[in-house]
Every structure is written in C-alpha cells, then in structure tokens.
Amino acid sequence: MNKSPKVLLFALVVRCIFCAAFVCADDLKPIQLPPPQTEIGKPLMQALKLRQTSRSFDSKPLPRQELSNLLWAGDGINRADSGKRTAPSAMNCQEVDIYVALPEALYLYDPKTHSLVPVVAKDLREATGKQDFVKDAPLTLVYVADWARMKSATEADKQLYSGADVGFIAQNVYLYCASQGLAVVVRGSVDR
C-alpha cells in the first residue's frame, strides 16, 4: 500500500521532467538533412577489412552532410517506392528508432523525411553511457525498439527480432564509419 504513492509520485515527477523538456524542444526547429551521398566511400570488402571499434573521439562536430550519410547508411530509406530501409527488419516492422544526441539537443531521426525532429533541447550525450568518452564524442546514436509496431510477434520474438534489427543498423553504421575513417563504438554499458 505504501509503494503506490511513491510510484505515482515518481511517475508524476518523470512526466513533469519530460513535459518540461518537450516544451524546451519547441524552440528548436527540425533539421532537414541534405540528400545522402550514395556514391562515396570505400568498397565493401575494404570497409570490412578496416572495420574496428574505437573509444577515442575527436570532439569536433560532424559536418551535416556526414551526419546525413551516416544516418541514411544506418537505417535510411533506400527504396522510395516501398519505404524499405538500408537495414532489414523482422516482418518489415521497422520498429527501431534512432535518437541522435548532439551537443545542442536530442533529436529523432525520421527516415521518411530524412530529417532530425527535436525532442529535448539539452546535451544528453553524457547521460547515454557510463564511460568517460561518451561526453566527448560529437554525437551518440541511441537505438530504441517500439514493440507496439510488432503486433503479430510474441513477447519473446519481439526481444529477439528487435535485438537483431538493432544489430543490423549498428553494423551498417560501423561499415559506413570504416569506409569514411570515422571512430565508432557500440556500447551496452548504459543505465537501464
């Protein structure tokens, strides 16, 4: 009986924090990314050879074109007629969203418009992980699976499929970074 008020209070506090954050995001405008440059980069076999994890990042911001290319490679639309993506997804649920934590704000990548939609007007990079280097990286990608989009899957399959789908997107990001000489690391050590 005593736990209910605490849970309710916690939920109310969380709701207030998020509402305040969304109000702040209203001041930000969506960012229309330039079209991806699909004719650049190293051949696949060379990118595979160069693929590696790095935990050392230049804090210099990525140019807008580089960010556009990176997000499109990760999970952009590569078949406009069907809306299908560069990364496969189980049953084509496309349940994984990519949040982009930049110094000025947190954005949601919208593959349909190839744009960044503002979510929170705050630098949340440091909050995305426990490692010291996360605050220095020019950006952090956060992959979030929305299981509500996986209506016909069982609970066990939702976990399995979304884990695989995030892996496909992350591998695309790794290969793009290898082809462009960018540092990248997938992290699992995060506050849950």
Where are these regions (language model features)?
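Bacterial N-terminal signal peptides
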Residues: 10-20
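N-terminal amphipathic, basic helical "cap/leader" segment at the start of enzyme domains
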Residues: 25-137
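Short secondary-structure capping/junction motifs at helix and strand boundaries
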Residues: 5, 80-84, 182-183
